[in-house]
Curated annotation (Swiss-Prot):
Keywords: ATP-binding, Carbohydrate metabolism, Kinase, Nucleotide-binding, Transferase. Belongs to the carbohydrate kinase PfkB family. SUPFAM superfamilies: Ribokinase-like. The keyword Cell membrane does not apply. This is Fructokinase. Involved in sucrose metabolism. InterPro entries: Carboh/pur_kinase_PfkB_CS (IPR002173), PfkB_Carbo_kinase (IPR050306), PfkB_dom (IPR011611), Ribo/fructo_kinase (IPR002139), Ribokinase-like (IPR029056). Signal peptide: none annotated. Its EC number is 2.7.1.4. GO terms for biological process: fructose metabolic process. It catalyses: D-fructose + ATP = D-fructose 6-phosphate + ADP + H(+). One of its GO terms (molecular function) is fructokinase activity. It comes from Klebsiella pneumoniae. The lineage of its organism: Bacteria, Pseudomonadati, Pseudomonadota, Gammaproteobacteria, Enterobacterales. PROSITE patterns: PFKB_KINASES_1, PFKB_KINASES_2.
């Protein structure tokens, strides 16, 4: 198949602690990370979104272009500023985020910013793109357009509750996006939030019954991944690594997964899914072994050596 993978949303400059009182400027943002992750694996990826026509925005556009991501639909907005996030890391490499620019340029995405979609292509989005207008309406228009064209939707909620003024808006937008998604990736916490159940088996059953995605993946960190494919459910253990920074692990996982799905299609059974999940899990594991979300994303050669 080898369909193009479009990724829509925010491109962010992450500011990471780097010694006493210093911050390291790193390219990031979950959608931008996924686009670069796919390109590093040899996939055809394109980024859809807005950044400010400012030093950070030009830095992000140049970075993605250098990574061989199609940036023809990555707009520079002179009226807005690029999203900037301070990332705090604890002793285990776990992170918290402080968003410094609100609203940022990515939330001003317009329908005219969208590419023409085609059959066999994928569109991956996160919920930050749904958190405010006009990005919300534009993102839903994109999701509906690629489905009409015969393409596929991948959704990673990547919930940041503090970016939403109305909690009910968050739930309504999540429900609408989940109903359009062919492939869904959630954390355990997100599964509990959306399903209303702290039991992972019950939560998966509830989401499958309500939204009927073809593929639902629940990442459990060191415990691995729970996968539900066409009604079949199985657990896939994780490979052990020493984590330095977990910032880009989920995005690397999604990039590996999408690269596999775009190349082979969504499999009919869990046994056929196993190679794509192994690729995704290896990408996620390797991304935790270095500091920075995008800088740690693995290349195809890294995977071949690891596998």
């Amino acid at each position: 198949m080898n369909g193009k993978i479009w990724v829509l949303g925010d491109a962010v400059v992450d500011l990471l602690p780097d010694g006493e009182g210093r911050l390291l400027q790193c390219p990031g943002g979950a959608p931008a990370n996924v686009a670069v992750g796919v390109a590093r694996l040899g996939g055809d990826s394109g980024f859809i979104g807005r950044v400010g026509d400012d030093p950070f925005g030009r830095f992000m556009r140049h970075t993605l272009a250098q990574e061989q991501v199609d940036v023809n639909y990555m707009r520079l907005d002179a009226a807005q500023r690029t999203s900037t996030v301070v990332v705090d890391l604890d002793s285990h490499g776990e992170r918290t985020f402080t968003f410094m620019v609100r609203p940022s340029a990515d939330l001003f995405l317009q329908p005219e910013d969208l590419p023409p979609f085609a059959a066999g292509q994928w569109l991956h989005v996160c919920s930050i793109a749904l958190s405010a207008e006009p990005s919300r309406s534009t993102t839903f228009a994109a999701l509906e357009a690629i489905k009409r064209a015969g393409g596929y939707v991948s959704f990673d909620p990547n919930i940041r509750s503090d970016l939403w003024q109305d909690p009910q808006d968050l739930r309504d937008c999540l429900d609408r996006a989940l109903a359009l998604a062919d492939a869904i990736k959630l954390s355990e916490e997100e599964l509990a939030f959306i399903s209303g159940s702290d039991d992972i088996v019950s939560g998966i059953a509830r989401l499958n019954a309500r939204f009927q995605p073809t593929l639902l993946l629940v990442t459990q960190g060191k415990a691995g991944v729970q996968a539900a494919l066409r009604g079949q459910v199985s657990h896939f253990p994780a490979r052990p690594v020493v984590a330095v920074d977990t910032t880009g692990a989920g995005d690397a996982f999604v990039a590996g997964l999408l690269a596999g799905l775009a190349a082979h299609g969504i499999p009919d059974n869990l046994a056929a899914l196993a190679p794509d999940l192994a690729l995704a899990q290896t990408c996620g594991a390797l991304a935790t072994t270095a500091k920075g979300a995008m800088t740690a994303l693995p290349y195809k050669d890294d995977l071949q050596r690891s596998l």
